[in-house]
Amino acid sequence: MERLIDVASYPVLPVLDKLLQNKSTKKNIIWATDTYASFGNGFQDTDQIDRTLLLQHADVIRPRIRKSMEDQAQRTRKKAEVFTPAWVCNEMNNVCDEDWFHRKNVFNTPQEDHSWIPTEGKIELPKRKRWQRYVDSRRLEITCGEAPYLCSRYDASTGERIEPLNSRIGIVDRKLRIVNENTKTREEWVKWAVRALDASYGYEYQGDNVLIARVNLFLTFIDYYKDRWGEIPPGKLLRKIANRIAWNIWQMDGLKDIVPTGKPYEEFHQMTFGELFSLDWEEAERKMEEAAAIPAVIYHWRSKISVLFRKVKEKTMGKKLFDFVIGNPPYNEDFGKSGNNGKYAKPIYHRFMDAAYSIAPKVELIHPARFLFNAGSTPKEWNEKMLNSSQFKVLEYEANSARVFSNTDIKGGVVISYFDRNASYKPIGTFTTFPELNSILKKVKSLSDTFVSSIVSGRGIYKLSDKALKEHPEIIDIQSKGHKKDVGPGALNKLEHIVFFDNLPNDDNKYVQFLGLKEGKRSYCWTREDYQDVPDSFYKYKIFIPKANGSGALGEVLSTPLIGEPLIGATETFLSIGMFDDFLEAANCLKYIKSKFTRVMLGILKITQDNTKTKWNYVPMQDFTPSSDIDWSQSVHDIDLQLYQKYGLDDVRGQ
């Protein structure tokens, strides 16, 4: 198999020392991953990448697609790596160029099969724009990994080489094509090829990725030089290029703007009394050195100055350094850091989005889409901010993430978004997956005052009583910390023979039934009424429906909703809908919930398996009594037809 990256061979080997430099620390970049820890000293998470040690194991530096499946899975989970296919990078880079050239498909034309046809002939420039301005446009790929947006020697998701050169789709590839087509002498070509690199930036957390990205840019420059001049560049030029790349592809924690593994930046460390009089001065100095995290430094080539990256976020610098930011940010923290026994991964992509908006006027990113439906775990206030922003819009939405990132399930899909600081777009407001849903929602809202969410229970409406805890204090040890009164999804199993019983006990206490899951199956168990704190709906008819249901596909059938009779409660596995005086009203509500109309309206916000109260915000409330404008005695199909007529809708059979 062809080696895409070989740090031990010419022409990389002579400049490897340059490509390993960290300009912020004036040392080498560090590994910042434990993937290679088994090789011993020098390969640990915080170790610098030493040239001599690296060359003893040079074959470990290879694209992620060439790593073992185990390593890929570990890095995807632990470091939130999702590598972007070339066709996605191409389409996103095309948007960036559409903004500059004021026309679509400048360098190539994407095809339905995700291939692309390169533009033949010389690239035509817009009137009153010089090609040098395009080369000098400063573009940053955040969390760049192997730098697939910047250069495209190969497809990062498949490992396949991209040839010939005019088929390549990276930012630097496009700039070097423009340089090729508009320069005549070697001196002029070198000048502008160097400037193309000067204006192309990327940062990355993990040291192996930083090195691979740098090597990819370095070899990309050589490819274009050889294609134009028929030979490899001279050694002096190669070292100049390697040095520039070491500046422009830097190692950084993108949320803290510091060199990885450092603590938050501290400009001055106040020595403690103990440190001041400690006999172990070396230890005290080591602690001081660790306490002061090193801020990332980048270089402004036109101004010929280095600057702290965090200064770029200040308004005095923000509009001067980057014209455009692009990329695929990490989606979540390491699962092990976010709680819930490693089953929950806290989202962080929204923080990278905000950071990108602070350093460039235009930003294009691909990331999870759940926030568009006010779902997921991103802060609700942040969701609202984005949905109501006049500077933010959606370019493309894909509900099935596996169509973009193979074998990757991202609940709620993924979206390519675009931010323009100077734009005035119509705010998204309510995002719908299909254009037809916008008109349906508009009609329904115009004829509706209340919605089903107003009668859907929130989580935790059933609680264990103080009496249950007093008579059985062992419950506190059995329950999760901070949830001693919860009647959670596993309550029928966890509290069996204490609170819940399969068979009705033969004693003088009053017992009621609870619906829940036992060994994965729906079950009814008996519980003492005085062991439960219950809502008013407990004494009425209601509908029970699973809190988690399906995948989020529009219009999907709900998992067997059922009527809960009076004196029947439920664990947190189920939502409770309504509080009806008689069985007929509950039966009518059940028919409504089963209707296609309801399922489509529910699907506007329910884009994952999560089926919470807020997902019902756009399902209009109905009168379920015999005096209703809907004849509930009809079949569910005929009820659908009545609902379509009521709201002036075409049959939503196609939804």
Language model features with spans:
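C-terminal substrate-recognition regions of SAM-dependent nucleic acid methyltransferases
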Residues: 75, 82, 87, 96, ...
